[in-house]
């Protein structure tokens, strides 16, 4: 069960969570917790998906931010992947697809047939996931 309750109380000094409940002084603390947990999850999935690639691609740095028109960006020159923080609202498979998509740009620089073949090696359901992310 992934649901939890948030309890705001001015008497609390630090955030605490147990038994599917988050106890916090204010919503700012809750936002910080969500950001911290998002960073952990995204980095963990980046490491996992990076290891799927047999090619010698560089391990990129990770930036997470809210983007209005993209789910991810690959900057090959800076060896950086930027992920949209809103991906945390989607199933893990969607996050993995976006990471695989961006890592595939280290192998193929465009959206050629070879690029999509690369993506499909690691994310066979990518077409369905793309549909989910467009809705």
Task: Pin down the residues of each PLM region.
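Active-site-proximal or metal-binding-adjacent scaffold patches in catalytic folds
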Residues: 1-97, 106-135
